[in-house]
A protein has these predicted regions:
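Sec-dependent N-terminal signal peptides
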Residues: 2-11
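GH16 jelly-roll
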Residues: 16-279
């Protein structure tokens, strides 16, 4: 395993490693499971999830602000609930006006998460150049201003062209854009496409930690000193599951590596087994 911690926009930052007490405080056995999604029903639970549709132009951010190519739909061509799992299906259809389609599910206005708590998600990523699966969170309210002032929590994002690596990142700051995160790399045999892994967000008051399969990734316990009263991560956030196609984060998509209507095995789908939140 290999972990690389990255910081963009800082002259200095302290306290990467959580203390033993910090970790114990969140992993106590008396934590209660307060929300879960096991995807065991054959239909999507619309009390928990909504579809965000379009290509971003509807929100004034065509390409979703990252030059992404997909159009998000609520079509059964782009997702399925089977084997007790959610499977997001990024799709290439050369005969459609919407060449690339996918699904983006959000809990916005339905379920919000607040600290302190522990959020864990069991997942597999799709394999294919240009695919960009993500598990992330955005603020319920932009209390401190528009992005990134009110924060963004990326539990997991990955590139379908490199199934040995995932990233966890925090986005924030009042003047410009700063981020703190880490890359986590595994062996070919343990890659994120063929094997399930669990990402855990340990979300405290004034501090955040990420773990993959109980392996420490990155700890943030010093941003309150930098941001003061405008520290955004003590607010309520909602959850997002999606797979983008193309964009600034990934290479240009190869259509032959992406699902088509008549050819799509599970290796090309973003699969989520469960989501659980403890407090």
């Amino acid at each position: 395993k290999f972990i690389f911690i990255f910081i963009i926009g800082f002259n200095s930052l302290h306290a990467f490693q959580p203390s033993i007490e910090d970790t114990k405080n969140f992993l106590k056995p008396e934590l209660n499971l307060v929300w879960q999604e096991e995807f065991s029903d054959p239909k999507l639970n619309t009390d928990k999830w909504a579809f965000q549709l379009g290509n971003g132009a509807e929100y004034g951010i065509a390409g979703w602000g990252n030059n992404e190519l997909q159009f998000y739909t609520d079509s059964s061509d782009n997702f399925e609930l089977s084997d007790g799992m959610l499977k997001i299906i990024p799709l290439y259809n050369k005969d459609s006006s919407k060449t690339f389609t996918s699904v983006k599910l959000v809990t916005k206005d339905l379920v919000n998460f607040t600290s302190p708590g522990v959020l864990e998600v069991k997942f597999k990523i799709p394999k294919g150049q240009g695919l960009w699966p993500a598990i992330w969170m955005m603020p319920e309210k932009n209390r401190f201003g528009g992005w990134p002032k009110s924060g963004e929590i990326d539990l997991m994002e990955a590139r379908g062209s490199n199934t040995n690596e995932v990233l966890s990142t925090l986005h924030f700051f009042q003047n410009g854009h700063r981020l703190l995160g880490s890359e986590y790399k595994v062996s070919n045999e343990n890659n994120f496409n063929q094997n399930f892994h669990i990402i855990t967000l340990i979300w405290g008051i004034d501090k955040i930690s990420f773990y993959i399969d109980n392996q420490f990734l990155v700890y943030e316990g010093s941003l309150t000193k930098l941001l003061g009263a405008k520290y955004p991560f003590n607010e309520s956030f909602y959850l997002i599951l999606n797979t983008a196609i193309g964009g600034d984060f990934v290479k240009a998509p190869k259509p032959n590596e992406i699902c088509s209507l008549d050819n799509c095995d599970d290796s090309k789908k973003f699969i989520v087994d469960y989501i659980r939140y403890y407090q």
